[in-house]
């Protein structure tokens, strides 16, 4: 049964995050998805970020709405960019253009340790109405909503 890893901050849980999470469950099939959620301690963003507790709660609520049984996934706290993917046996890692370099680093470290590399599943950014990627930063700045719709100027 496939073990699939995906990680992130999942601030505002926007459509880009949804695509990553949905792809993880698609690839896992009858296997299990391990979602690494960035800890508060690890974050160093230019904008305020909701607490781990709030982000975890929203993530779990979203997965529940997807109808995924609890035994098909696990949410863990990420205290470093690689999380458990270095030591544990995963088959796939789901990445965005932003996290792709981390997956390459993970595979380099795994290979040095004699472990098989993870199959990297690359998921493109989801674009907002203006053709620019949806991001938590843009949402935080009030440019777009979680679905990439442009906010009207006041």
Swiss-Prot record:
InterPro entries reported in the protein's UniProt record: Cyt_trans-like (IPR004821), PPAT_arch (IPR023540), Rossmann-like_a/b/a_fold (IPR014729)
Enzyme Commission number(s) of this protein: 2.7.7.3
Keyword Ion transport annotated: no
Protein's cellular compartments: Cytoplasm
GO biological process: coenzyme A biosynthetic process
Domain of life of the native organism: Archaea
CDD domains to which the protein is assigned, alphabetical: PPAT_CoAS
Record keyword Transmembrane helix present: no
Keywords noted in UniProt: ATP-binding, Coenzyme A biosynthesis, Cytoplasm, Nucleotide-binding, Nucleotidyltransferase, Transferase
A GO molecular-function annotation: ATP binding
Reactions the enzyme catalyzes: (R)-4'-phosphopantetheine + ATP + H(+) = 3'-dephospho-CoA + diphosphate
Pathway: Cofactor biosynthesis; coenzyme A biosynthesis
A single Gene Ontology CC term: cytoplasm
NCBIfam families (alphabetical): cyt_tran_rel, PRK00777.1
Annotated family: Belongs to the eukaryotic CoaD family.
Job description of the protein: Reversibly transfers an adenylyl group from ATP to 4'-phosphopantetheine, yielding dephospho-CoA (dPCoA) and pyrophosphate.
Name of the featured protein: Phosphopantetheine adenylyltransferase
Source organism of this protein record: Methanosarcina mazei (strain ATCC BAA-159 / DSM 3647 / Goe1 / Go1 / JCM 11833 / OCM 88) (Methanosarcina frisia)
Gene name, Swiss-Prot/TrEMBL: coaD
